[in-house]
Every structure is written in structure tokens, then in C-alpha cells.
Amino acid sequence: MDKRLDKKYTKEWFILLGLLLGVTVTNGFARFAYGLLLPAMQAEMDWNYAQAGWLSTVNALGYIVGAISTMFLVQKFASEKLFAFGLITTSVVLLMTGVLPTLEAQYALRFFAGTFGAVSFSTAGAIASGLFKENARLNALSIAILFGTGGGFGIILAGAFIPTLIDVVGNSAWPICWIIIGLLSIVFMPFGIWSALQIESSKPSRLTRNEFRLLKMLPELAGYACFGFGYIVYLTFLSAWMTGQSIDATMITTIWVILGLCICISPFLWRPIFARFGNGIPLAMVLSSIAFGSVVPLLSPAFSILILSAVIFGSSVFMAPGAITNFTRKNLPQEMWAYSISIFTVLFAISQTLGPYVAGLIGDYFDNIGMGLVTAFIILLLGALVSLSQKELSKN
């Protein structure tokens, strides 16, 4: 009988499904649904650009706080417990986002969404790395599915109903959208918690300076920081461009669903690469693909070009977390996985905070938002080149 079909593997696939739904909440909903709802929130609540911009900033700051906290928490608590805690708290925060509409409450909720989401997202990869230990190909596929399909599924769900509901009801529907997202999160939450409880409890990380070879991982770390800087510029541009072009709800839904679908199928495209390489090549290839997907819109403002861009970008963007998780699993002992991924997440959180700001300054200087995309393109390619120099490490 095919090992994929025996009882042991069947249970592991269900565990992966639960983890995937957790990532749908903490990544797909908590981070990317906000981009769809911000224009309606800003118009209905009469926020200026500075107020709306600070909502993104406090969310990014919360993500930094959560990522840094996870670095220390994984040395005291098992990854499974931290994942469940982050999933529960993020689900509650998303529901409350639709209940408390004041600007002050939104600042606090966006901060906590970033903080709790980072805790759960950072530990999800470490948990998934322990699945299918006897089968390198299935292990690589499970890591890719976790980040790709998990985040992509959230984008598909949010993109399928938010633009249409806003178009039919009006901007005043934004709290309803958040409540729907919150309720979906609460529905998904038990599956994620169940999956975490099925995993054999991992030992908290116990590290010394000599055990964690940070300097030998610098190319991979630098490449991932470049990913954080570059990818967020594109997503910021995508929302702004479609809003500025007065694209109707059907076309906006089409773009987001295509983007989400490509993210969902991306694990199957990248699985052979993850299974084959334990060095910096997977991250370098992912960053190169994201870079070219980001710059495609500059070729033409045509809607078809934007679709092409979404396909290229969506097929690779969520594979960067998968690439660094795959690198961690293949190069470090299991007790170091969560700590390693949390360090990657801290760098990512900081760089994604700086990305839109720097790109915005460049766009303002040239009076052309396209120059921000060019900047992201250059940074992503630079990250790809640096990642290529990353060699495999010895686990011993």
C-alpha cells in the first residue's frame, strides 16, 4: 500500500489541515484581509491618510513585538502551546475588530493582531517540520502547503466576499466583514488547536551561543530580510492601484481570487525544489520569482498585465517562509527549529515595516509609485543573489 494512504500518514494530513486553517487565520485573515477593507474603513470613518497609515504601522510594530517575544517564549514553552495561544487570541481580536469601530480601539486591535499572529505563525512552521519525518518529499510538501495554501485560502475567502459586500451594502459594511472574518476564524480555531494537541510535545529550545550558528546563516537571514522589504511593497501597490483606477468589485474580486488560487497551488510547484536542496537555492529562486512578478505591472497598466503579475507573484510569495523553514529543518536539530524560525521572523517583521516607507519616499521623490516597485525589484534580486551563497550546515 502507498505510504501516503496508510493510517499514520492519513492522520498527519489531517494534522496539517488543522495547522493550515490556523495559518489561514493568523496570516490570510489577520494580515491580508485588512488591505481589502482599509479603503472602506477610511472612507466610512473619515480617517485621513496619516491615521490610516498608522493602523498599518502599529500592526507591523505588533508583529515585531510578537516575533521578538517568540524568540524567548520558545525557550520556556513548547511550540504547540504557543501556536494554540496565538491562534485563539488572534481569532478573538479579529472578531472584536468588527465590534469596536473607534480609531483608538482599531489601533489597539491591529497591534494585538500583529503580536498574537506572529507568535502563532512563527511556531506553525516548527510544528509542521515534524510531520512526515520518514519521507523527505512529503515533509517538504507539507511545509510548502502550510504557508502557501494556508495563507492563500484566507485571501481567497476574503477576496471572494469583501469587495462584493462593500459594493452592494456600501462602506458601512466594513464591521460586518470583520465580524464574518472573526466568526470564520473561531470556526477554524478548534481544528488548529486539535492539530497542535496531536503533535508530540516538543521540548522548549535550550540554546547556547555555540549551538546556534547565526553567522553561518547570514546569507539566508539577509535574503529573508530582503523578502520582507520587497513583497510588502507590491501588496501595498496592488491595493492602491486598483482603488485609484476605480476598478469595479467584480474585477477586484477576480484579481484577489486569482492571487489566492496561485498561492494555494504554489506548494506543488515548489515541493521538488524544497525536497532537493538544503542550501540557499530555494530562497534565491523564490525571491527571483517574486521580483519579476512585482515589476511586471510597469510594462503596461492593462488589466491583463495585472493578472499576469498576480499569477507570477502569487505562485511564489508565500514560499519564502516555506524556504527558510525547509532550510531550518534540514540544517538544525529539532530543538532549535522554533528559535531559528523566530529569528527569521524578527528580521522579516522589521524589514516589512521599513519597506512601504522607503518605497513611498522614493515614489514621492520621483512622483511615480512605479519607482517604489523598481526599488522592491532591486532589493528582492539582491536578496536572491545573497541567498545563493548560503551553504548547507552540519547538524552535528
Where are these regions (language model features)?
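Helix-to-loop junctions at the C-terminal end of transmembrane segments
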Residues: 66-78, 266-278, 363-364
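A late C-terminal transmembrane helix in Major Facilitator Superfamily
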Residues: 329-368, 376
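Helix-loop-helix hairpin linking two adjacent transmembrane segments in secondary transporters
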Residues: 102-105, 138-196
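Paired small-residue
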Residues: 93, 104-113, 304-312
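Conserved MFS/SLC helix-loop-helix module at the cytosolic interface between two early adjacent transmembrane helices
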Residues: 65-102
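C-terminal transmembrane helical hairpin of 12-TM major facilitator-type secondary transporters
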Residues: 278-327
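Cytoplasmic helix-loop-helix junction between adjacent transmembrane helices
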Residues: 109-149
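Extracytoplasmic gate region of multi-pass secondary transporters
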Residues: 34-35, 216-257, 263-264
